[in-house]
């Protein structure tokens, strides 16, 4: 075995993809010292997507002052690549849930304004190509905060300018984009997301995600009504119907809210990573792909990171072995095309112990070593 590609997603709540790959690499090096090992950063559009891209592309890190979800000053950073032409921005760095104490979370009052400030900063630096990862937000403002920071105005029925927060979507009567930053006309945005929810409705942004962001049941209804109303206003102003567009409900409606006003497209995070980092070229001469995530189940094959990896492996006729902290539906996963699906737990443990980072890394190392030892016997 001459070349193994390590393409692990994070084991959420336990260990990140980089550390998982390091543990796997150690085991392979001990058993197959002459094997070429390629570590490939993976994420599916949620937290870690832009970090994975910045790491792999050796991005220049720049910092700027913006506003957090409650419009308090905060310093954030993002990556610049391609000789200053492309900015890689993590939405959550300016308006993510971790920025707000759990008892203060309220998507009626939060805004994506800071993300727009990050984009404006990148435009000043000359960037015209953008990748924005939109997982983990504390907002439900459909992106009006970001657009306001870039020059848009949202007016009520009395021509008063609205604060760009979730509770005001229902009040939007007019949209004024005449003062949008002119550099946006020559810019392109790839919006990387990890969900396919529509803009509103029972499977939409408010009903599915607003409770995690602090909304009570009445606020969920208000936010959903706001999204419905705003989608209709957008349709009247732009003739674009975003209501049931897959992914439009990502990040509190930001997924769909940007499309009518920017040269933007929604893509799954894993597709963005695989395309940007040319994963297929990496895999083409490989003998094996090792991948994995915290839990392997039927959802694994539904547009998530491992599904993208598997499809490339199948195209290049390279076997794919997946490791998981917990494994369900093994036969279904095999039918999807995985060569093998293996749990890393050596014996029954509590969830707390299973999630302990050192325990997870030890289990990855031990399991990978056993996989490689079997392979050695059949490739002598």
Named regions from a protein language model:
Residues 2-134, 138-380:
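N-terminal loops that bind phosphate or other acidic moieties
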């Amino acid at each position: 075995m001459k070349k193994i590609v390590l393409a692990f997603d994070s084991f959420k709540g336990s260990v990140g993809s980089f550390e998982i790959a390091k543990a796997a690499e150690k085991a392979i090096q001990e058993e197959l010292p002459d094997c070429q090992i390629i570590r490939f950063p993976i994420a599916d559009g949620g937290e870690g997507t832009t970090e994975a891209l910045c790491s792999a592309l050796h991005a220049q890190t720049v910092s700027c002052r913006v506003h957090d979800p409650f419009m308090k000053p905060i310093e954030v950073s993002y990556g610049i690549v391609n000789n200053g032409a492309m900015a890689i921005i993590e939405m959550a760095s300016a308006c993510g849930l971790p920025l707000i104490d759990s008892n203060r979370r309220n998507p009626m009052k939060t805004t994506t304004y800071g993300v727009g400030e990050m984009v404006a900063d990148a435009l000043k630096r000359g960037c015209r190509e953008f990748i924005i990862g939109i997982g983990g937000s504390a907002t439900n403002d459909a992106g009006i905060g970001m657009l306001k920071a870039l020059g848009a105005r949202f007016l009520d029925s009395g021509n008063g300018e609205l604060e760009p927060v979730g509770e005001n979507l229902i009040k939007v009567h007019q949209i004024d984009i005449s003062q949008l930053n002119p550099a946006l006309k020559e810019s392109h945005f790839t919006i990387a997301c990890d969900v396919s929810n529509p803009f509103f409705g029972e499977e939409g942004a408010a009903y599915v995600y607003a409770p995690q962001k602090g909304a009570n049941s009445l606020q969920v209804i208000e936010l959903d009504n706001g999204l419905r109303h705003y989608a209709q206003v957008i349709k009247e102003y732009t003739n674009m119907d975003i209501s049931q567009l897959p992914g439009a409900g990502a990040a509190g409606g930001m997924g769909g809210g940007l499309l009518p006003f920017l040269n933007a497209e929604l893509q799954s995070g894993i597709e963005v990573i695989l395309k940007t980092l040319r994963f297929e070229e990496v895999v083409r001469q490989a003998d094996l792909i090792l991948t994995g995530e915290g839990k392997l189940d039927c959802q694994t094959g539904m547009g998530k990171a491992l599904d993208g990896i598997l499809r490339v492996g199948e195209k290049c006729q390279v076997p794919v072995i997946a490791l998981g902290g917990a494994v369900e539906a093994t036969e279904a996963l095999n039918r999807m095309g995985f060569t093998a699906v293996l749990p890393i737990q050596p014996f029954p443990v509590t969830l707390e112990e299973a999630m302990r980072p050192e325990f997870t890394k030890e289990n990855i190392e031990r399991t990978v070593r056993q996989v490689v030892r079997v392979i050695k016997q059949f490739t002598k």
